[in-house]
Amino acid sequence: MPPAKKKPRAYDPAKIRAAVTAQFGHVARGVAELGPEQLARPSGLGAWTVAELAAHIAWIADSLAAGLARPPAAVPELTAVEWPFATASLAGKISEAARETLAGAPLPELYERAGAGMARALEAHTGARVLDLWIGDMTLADFLVTRTVELVVHTDDLNRAAGADIPLERQALAACTRLLADALALKAPGGSVEVRIPPFAVVQCIEGPRHTRGTPPNVVETDPLTWIRLATGRTDWAAALDEARVRASGERADLSALLPLMS
């Protein structure tokens, strides 16, 4: 008899909205403090400069407001946990949108406009609204969870590329970590390996003997930021093991063939 389908993780809509808003505010304040030399640095993401990466983050908020301004879609086609696997096909569109956004106004003005537009749009709509999106139609509630991934991942990118110290909102970091952990479990269903990302997530994955009691024989443990970098291709499995940022025990405790989940 096949195992019962796991119920998707539930997120508190109010906390997610607050986390997205707070993280965008952290980035806006951090970007305002970057100097010309920092903005001209390579971002580490293809050919983007730090300025283009910053413009992309402004676009994240701007595009959310634009999506809510469009007529709603009929039914959702994509859930939050499926979203990471659908992102690769949009890289070209997103890169072009970042360049167009940066050409539109200075960064401080972009952030002020995008933040205000996002706030107005979120105030006017409930999480049940279905957005008509490039990637596939999603409920606003699910799409906002994916915004925590975009914002946390790119805040980390900005910090590393520009030498900044923009804070990560705890609730945004938690939601990002959990969504990417659940995506791993969706990609490799099973119960032979336990992946621990304290204090936010524990999932089981990979086909094989399911552990039911005591200490699991196959365990992977890491911290949230290392997990996010692994899941998004910012670092690789071997390097994380060598640097002791990942602890893996058991013959099945190897996630290298499953990572990254998105890039």
Predicted feature residues:
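An N-terminal domain-cap segment
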Residues: P2-A51
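Short, helix-capping/interhelical loops that line the mouth of catalytic, cofactor-
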Residues: P2-K15, S63-A116
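C-terminal interaction segments
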Residues: P2-K6, R70, F85, S89, ...
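Amphipathic alpha-helix face/heptad-repeat signature
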Residues: I16-Q23, L107-A114, L144-R147, L173, ...
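Short, contiguous alpha-helical
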Residues: R41-A80, V130-L179
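Internal, conserved structured core segments that host functional sites
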Residues: I94-R147
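A glycine-rich beta-turn/hairpin centered on an aromatic-Pro dipeptide
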Residues: Q171-P199
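Glycine/small-residue-rich hydrophobic helix-like segments
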Residues: P189-T226
